[in-house]
């Protein structure tokens, strides 16, 4: 198994992907910290608003803007005084607003869109928006020239493929024929002129009138008004989407599939890797977190003297020794199970597998993140 050092040296974008609950966010932060330690100007973009993760990076809370990690805290964690590490949480609304302002024909047109209640719902709730905006924000960070590397922690999802599919689903929704019919202006096509245009216009009005009766208000007319105002940006969204797809497939991008050593989770990670390869996304390796490593066997005869030396009362030594031996047996059974999962991953990518053992406590500070990174870079042998 190789370590991640070459990837951290050469990549411009690292995407940590996988199902929820496998340690993606912690892994992304640990990778970003190691990259900063090597001298690269690094930003980590997370979707996880957890205060605990922000605290582990030395921040009070995440914001929608990149925040520079205090240099004194980085020095205390073993980095040089000129190391540069920033972190931010995705703010979907702010990212979408920036796109509208950037691509609208003028300020008045941007304001009409931004103030529309349907846009406000669209920019935060429509399926695929979060994933689309995450990569859009990455593109902005890289284009700023302030960072050598951006690490993207993908949104939590039941299935890791949601991250790859969601932006395309979003654009397909915007291209939907029914949506186009709602917002299409009367003079948008060569056939929509004269009597035909009037007939089509009356048809729309009749449909809207019927739907408004069902919804209790001018819902669809208002929606059509929003879509017509927003339609001028559709091509910009399509263009941005193509640029995003190019970025995700670039030679300087790598996807790290994060998993945990549970059979179902490993199967999904292996399938996700196959889909990455099939779709032309650059696979950078598996990271398997929380792996139980085997411990040497012991006996009550060996434990009792150790308990006595630790000051455990006479009548408690034998029962405690039995409990400790039972716990050791349980641990080694889980280690055997985890070893099977590691073998399954190694069969697929033997040189691209990185293992982080189960740590004695949760990662809650820069030292903990540094320890995770040390395992990924092979500085700590398992």
Regions found by a protein language model. Name each.
Residues 1-8, 205-228, 238-382:
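C-terminal lobe/tail of nucleotide-utilizing enzymes
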Residues 15-17, 119-124, 253-258, 327:
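Glycine- and acidic
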Residues 17, 45-47, 152-155, 256-260, ...:
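Generic beta-strand/beta-sheet core signal
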């Amino acid at each position: 198994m190789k370590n991640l050092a070459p990837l951290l040296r050469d990549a411009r974008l690292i995407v940590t992907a996988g199902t929820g609950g496998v340690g993606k966010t912690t892994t992304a932060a640990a990778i970003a910290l190691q990259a900063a330690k090597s001298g690269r100007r690094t930003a980590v973009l997370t979707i996880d608003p957890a205060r605990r993760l922000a605290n582990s990076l030395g921040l009070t809370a995440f914001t929608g803007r990149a925040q520079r990690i205090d240099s004194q805290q980085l020095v205390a964690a073993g980095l040089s005084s000129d190391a540069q590490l920033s972190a931010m949480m995705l703010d979907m609304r702010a990212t979408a607003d920036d796109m509208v302002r950037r691509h609208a024909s003028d300020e008045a047109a941007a304001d009409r869109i931004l103030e529309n209640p349907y846009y406000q719902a669209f920019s935060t709730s429509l399926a695929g928006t979060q994933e689309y905006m995450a990569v859009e924000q990455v593109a902005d960070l890289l284009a700023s020239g302030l960072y050598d590397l951006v690490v993207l922690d993908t949104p939590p999802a039941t299935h890791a493929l949601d991250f790859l599919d969601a932006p395309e689903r979003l654009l397909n929704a915007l291209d939907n024929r029914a949506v186009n019919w709602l917002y299409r202006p009367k003079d948008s096509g060569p056939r929509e002129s004269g009597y035909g245009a009037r007939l089509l216009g009356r048809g729309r009005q009749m449909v809207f009138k019927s739907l408004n009766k069902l919804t209790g208000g001018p819902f669809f007319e208002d929606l059509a008004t929003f879509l017509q105002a927003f339609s001028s940006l559709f091509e910009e969204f399509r263009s941005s989407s193509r640029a995003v797809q190019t970025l995700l497939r670039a030679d300087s991008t790598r996807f790290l599939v994060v998993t945990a050593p549970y059979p179902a989770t490993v199967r999904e990670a292996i399938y996700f890797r196959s889909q990455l390869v099939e779709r032309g996304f650059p696979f950078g390796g598996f990271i398997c977190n929380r792996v139980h490593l085997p411990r040497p066997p012991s006996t009550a005869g060996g434990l009792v003297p150790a308990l006595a030396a630790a000051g455990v009362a006479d009548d408690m030594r034998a029962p405690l020794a039995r409990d400790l031996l039972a716990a050791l047996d349980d641990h080694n059974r889980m280690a055997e199970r985890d070893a099977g999962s590691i073998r399954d991953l190694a069969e697929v990518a033997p040189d691209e597998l990185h293992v982080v053992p189960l740590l004695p406590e949760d990662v809650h500070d820069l030292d903990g993140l540094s320890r995770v990174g040390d395992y990924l870079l092979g500085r700590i042998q398992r």
